[in-house]
């Protein structure tokens, strides 16, 4: 079967990951001891995508958990699903990365990376036909960003033909945890552009907004935010885990969403999002789902798709739906908002349908869009980066770990190139495209 190996790193990654496993276990009828207590044969049919079956019919997640300090892991172990993970798969250091990318990537992280790779190798050998990896991490801290990208590049070397998908939490514009976030994020993006296949871009501010506006929560906790993320993560992979009329997997997703290899940063959304009080008043229908799914307020990162154009998009519908109706609604969206789609990629919206809805819902949908407006995120981080780097602020923390200023300059220009590429394809029209391409080829 097409297994996916899940890796979570750093505090943020481990907290998102923990929530994700709660959702996945719930969908497959696995209780917190790893025993199957479900009621449908469909839950077990392809359970091996995310779980190993151990002795005594116990199901163990294919998850590798890493951190440079023991704190988050300890609280995860004592949490509701702490006992389900394989104890050998917890890999942690003691020193912490102190929000320093260089520590995660070059010094502390580099010491721990081999033991992480051993666990990854063991899990990969345990699988029958590994499809790829999914990594949960944040880009603002030290471990998730520095060590996370180090691990991604090592895995890339060892498994070059497997898909690499990341769920990356970007630093958000108004909610900042640390001063050096722009440095860490820029250095990470520099790595992700080269080594990852698909990046789902998330950020806390957009998630807070969804909690306030749509879910009407007065004071949302990180638990609430992570729940949103885990709903999306489960939606992206549901086609692999349950039978469906139109299936997709990580590779199909990539082929349909990535027109140019560097432009693989996606916005994600989930529908239906309703506040707990108002659920009973609305019946779900495909048009309503589609409407909410494409709504700019629903995107889980702080970029507004109305400021750019969609290169491609993909929608995963779950539940007992008619494929015909899904297709009609998707065509409808494209026809009504044709100016928001680039005209030089015809049929650029793909939909897939999975028969099993998430727990407690009749139908749901997950949205993944490759929009040029994501450049807003990179642009914002890049401006903050430049403001500090111009004054060489906080730089000694990085050079002290053996980094070179040159690396910062490279990362900065790579990020700016990425923004320029998005802008170029946003402005391109069907007619002039061929000539531009030719000119560029001669120049290089």
Swiss-Prot record:
Its cofactor is Mg(2+). GTP binds at residues 11, 69, 138, 142-144, 204, 226. It holds the Pfam family Tubulin. GO terms for molecular function: GTP binding; GTPase activity; metal ion binding; mRNA binding; structural constituent of cytoskeleton. One of its GO terms (biological process) is microtubule-based process. It comes from the Eukaryota. Belongs to the tubulin family. Tubulin is the major constituent of microtubules, a cylinder consisting of laterally associated linear protofilaments composed of alpha- and beta-tubulin heterodimers. Microtubules grow by the addition of GTP-tubulin dimers to the microtubule end, where a stabilizing cap forms. Below the cap, tubulin dimers are in GDP-bound state, owing to GTPase activity of alpha-tubulin. Dimer of alpha and beta chains. A typical microtubule is a hollow water-filled tube with an outer diameter of 25 nm and an inner diameter of 15 nM. Alpha-beta heterodimers associate head-to-tail to form protofilaments running lengthwise along the microtubule wall with the beta-tubulin subunit facing the microtubule plus end conferring a structural polarity. Microtubules usually have 13 protofilaments but different protofilament numbers can be found in some organisms and specialized cells. There are nine genes coding for beta-tubulin. This is Tubulin beta-4 chain. It comes from Arabidopsis thaliana.
